[in-house]
């Protein structure tokens, strides 16, 4: 896992938490939770790829891992749309920078998960 990606996730989560304190938006809290979940899932897939023998463990532990993978891609698409929507509607430069970084990170993570999943298939 790229250390820049880890720090990017942490930075964006901290920034979103600051925005949440100012706006008390429940939707933003949901986005933060999904970002954290997505990071954990990506990390697990990355670890499974590093230890290719874990593919069988992954499949036996979760017989529906392809279905779960599909669900994660849907979550990523939803997050991308939500971030784009918020980016269009915000006038705060702090929020614009945060959402632009979040969008870039989501696209990078989507590509990483695709790469990991192809290696596992």
From Swiss-Prot:
Main location: virion
Compartment(s): Virion; Host nucleus
InterPro entries reported for this sequence: Flu_NS2
Top-level division of the source organism's lineage: Viruses
Keyword entries, A-Z: Host nucleus, Host-virus interaction, Transport, Virion
GO cellular component, one term: host cell nucleus
Any GO BP annotation: exit of virus from host cell nucleus through nuclear pore
Motif extent (Nuclear export signal): 12-21, 85-94
Family affiliation: Belongs to the influenza viruses NEP family.
Function: Mediates the nuclear export of encapsidated genomic RNAs (ribonucleoproteins, RNPs). Acts as an adapter between viral RNPs complexes and the nuclear export machinery of the cell. Possesses no intrinsic RNA-binding activity, but includes a C-terminal M1-binding domain. This domain is believed to allow recognition of RNPs bound to the protein M1.
Subunit description: Interacts with protein M1. May interact with host nucleoporin RAB/HRB and exportin XPO1/CRM1.
Name of this chain's protein: Nuclear export protein
Organism listed in the record: Influenza A virus (strain A/Gull/Maryland/1824/1978 H13N6)
């Amino acid at each position: 896992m790229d250390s820049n990606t880890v720090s990017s996730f942490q930075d964006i989560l901290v920034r979103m938490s600051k925005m949440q304190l100012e706006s008390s938006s429940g939707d933003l809290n949901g986005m933060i939770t999904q970002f954290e979940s997505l990071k954990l899932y990506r990390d697990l897939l990355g670890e499974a790829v590093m230890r290719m023998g874990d593919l069988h463990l992954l499949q036996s532990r979760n017989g529906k891992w392809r279905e779960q993978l599909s669900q994660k891609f849907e979550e990523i698409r939803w997050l991308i749309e939500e971030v784009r929507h918020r980016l269009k509607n915000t006038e705060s430069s702090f929020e614009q920078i945060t959402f632009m970084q979040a969008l870039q990170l989501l696209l990078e993570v989507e590509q990483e998960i695709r790469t990991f999943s192809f290696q596992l298939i």
